[in-house]
Curated annotation (Swiss-Prot):
GO terms for molecular function: ATP binding; ATP hydrolysis activity; ATPase-coupled phosphate ion transmembrane transporter activity. Its EC number is 7.3.2.1. It is found in: Cell membrane. Its main location: membrane. ATP binds at residues 38-45. Keywords: ATP-binding, Cell membrane, Membrane, Nucleotide-binding, Phosphate transport, Translocase, Transport. It is a peripheral membrane protein. It comes from the Bacteria. Part of the ABC transporter complex PstSACB involved in phosphate import. Responsible for energy coupling to the transport system. This is Phosphate import ATP-binding protein PstB 1. It comes from Streptococcus agalactiae serotype V (strain ATCC BAA-611 / 2603 V/R). The lineage of its organism: Bacteria, Bacillati, Bacillota, Bacilli, Lactobacillales. The keyword Iron does not apply.
Length: 252
């Protein structure tokens, strides 16, 4: 039986004294896309940020419970957060390319690791941009500013930047919500093509998107994980009334 690559156990997250995530437990499996759905403020993005310790610099954030990655406690004092975020990369809601060339955006993390060899960097750029399904669109513009690209292209460059550090897990926080439908569709195709190599957690507002590309879905409400399971089963036969009401649009 396949072992989970990531396990969240009884995880609670607090902002000051407000409990944003309440005793959540989930297992995530290799080479699957897991969609996280639910109304705004239900805890989906909080979970992503807890997984790769994005809350470390915010003194108002505290948490209890455990996050285990490949059997290691993410919150152990021995965990190197820089290395952790290379293993567990993140793509945000708004495309956030750096104000530099497409090439330098993609190799940014590699340069931080001290990699200077031109052939290595060139190969990483081509491989990562192909993985993000944007190589053909930018191969003649590698040294132009990434800020000159369309929003959808910028987001795929951000995905390529994440791929360049060779993560095992990619966290995606509503990566298509700021994009037009055509650009969003290209991102979905990209994610589907990456599934053989990566494990992905996707926060999405779109029920159609969740049903199209995810293997499992977790439904959150008011910081609670209401239901978690196979996507097709959940959408066809939800076990909880709250889940059914949400995915059928009775509230959102």
């Amino acid at each position: 039986m396949t072992q989970p690559i990531l396990q969240v156990s009884d995880l609670s997250v607090y902002y000051n004294k407000k409990k944003a995530l309440k005793e959540v437990s989930m297992d995530f499996y290799p080479n699957e896309i897991t969609a996280l759905i639910g109304p705004s403020g239900s805890g989906k993005s909080t979970l992503l940020r807890a997984i790769n310790r994005m809350g470390d610099l915010n003194p108002e954030v505290t948490l209890t419970g455990a996050v285990m990655y490949n059997g290691h406690n993410v919150y152990s004092p021995r965990t190197d957060t820089v290395e952790l975020r290379k293993e567990i990369g993140m793509v945000f809601q708004q495309p956030n390319p750096f104000p530099m060339s497409v090439f330098e955006n993609v190799v940014y993390g590699l340069r931080l690791k001290g990699i200077k060899d031109k052939a290595t960097l060139d190969e990483a750029v081509e491989t990562s941009l192909k993985g993000a399904s944007i190589w053909d669109e930018v191969k003649d513009r590698l040294h132009d500013s990434a800020l000159g690209l369309s929003g959808g292209q910028q987001q795929r460059v951000c995905i390529a930047r994440t791929l360049a550090t060779k993560p095992k897990i990619i966290l995606l926080d509503e990566p298509t919500s700021a994009l037009d439908p055509i650009s969003a569709g290209k991102i979905e195709e990209t994610l589907h093509g990456l599934k053989d190599q990566y494990t992905m957690l996707l926060v999405t507002r779109s029920m159609q998107q969740a049903s199209r590309i995810s293997d499992r879905t977790g439904f959150f409400l008011d910081g609670n994980l209401i239901e978690y399971g196979n996507t097709k089963e959940m959408f066809m036969n939800p076990k909880h009334k709250e889940t059914e009401d949400y995915i059928t649009g009775k509230f959102g």
